[in-house]
Amino acid sequence: MSWIIFYTVIAALLILDLRIIHKNNTIMSFKESVLFSLFYLVIACLFGIYVYYNTGADHAREYYTCFLIEKAMSLDNIFVISIIFQFFKIPWQYQHRVLFFGIIGVIIFRAVMIYGGIILINKFAWLLYIFAVILIATGIKTFYVSHKTFDIQNSYIYKSIIKNLNITPNLEGNKFIVKRNNKLYCTPLFISLVLIEAIDLVFAIDSIPAIFAITNDVYIIYTSNIFAILGLRALFFCLAEIVERFSYIKYSLALILIFISFKIFIHHYIAIPEYVAFTVTMTLLLFGIIASIIRKNMIDH
């Protein structure tokens, strides 16, 4: 029943998005972007309340902790998506179409990765320690790298697409694939969609291990992941303002990843309660937000 409720909510949100909010491919303003981002955030929080009443406080804390971590780590996806759209010169009115179908792929691929990861961890418990090392490396790198980049022209995926598929030189409206002379051609819109899906899989290698350190409950991991990613599409359209206002969140995220790694290494000796993990995650993110706001105000004055 819980899965039915989850997928019903997701389906309703996607239908609302495609058929009502973006029915005419209109460009989303900054104000609309912020409002819809808050709307998705409220829905995610309400679902957390449902988890609380359905499975208890511990699972609810796990859900919110996983949601916050995935939300923070997914911000880098926005940078790379922006690079991809700029590279292929995708107009604003078509970007939402790519992002919409991108989320469909994410729903499928994240399920495969999460289920596969849980099976591997249950069979090979030592994999968690490898994940911990990955998280430490990611956390340290986050301190020194402003944001993740993506060299499109030299990427294996882009080269493979160009080599093996027929590509149209220009956009064909909002179409992903067109037919010419009895041959199918992929448009730049389709290539950008494939690259965005591929990048999400790469970034998931960083974020999903962090979630596995919080819980191995498939329902909690998957639902928190999808709700966190859903709001990113709206968040994309106010990217510049977010980056400017909350520049210190990346340092909070780095500390969270290192804390989670520490939690993995000591869990056989000291079990850190989920409310502690949730409190640490919330506190570090709040410090990052507050520090960013203070810095912005100091610069403005």
UniProtKB/Swiss-Prot annotation:
Lineage, broadest ranks: Bacteria, Pseudomonadati, Pseudomonadota, Alphaproteobacteria, Rickettsiales
Family: Belongs to the TerC family.
InterPro entries linked: Integral_membrane_TerC, Integral_membrane_TerC_rswitch
Coiled-coil residues: none
Alphabetical list of Pfam families matching this protein: TerC
Bilayer-spanning residue ranges: 1-21, 33-53, 72-92, 101-121, 124-144, 194-214, 220-240, 253-273, 274-294
Organism: Rickettsia conorii (strain ATCC VR-613 / Malish 7)
UniProt keyword GTP-binding, yes or no: no
Protein's name according to its UniProt entry: Uncharacterized membrane protein RC1219
Keyword terms, alphabetized: Cell membrane, Membrane, Transmembrane, Transmembrane helix
GO cellular component, one term: plasma membrane
Keyword Transmembrane helix set for record: yes
Compartments where located: Cell membrane
Membrane topology: Multi-pass membrane protein
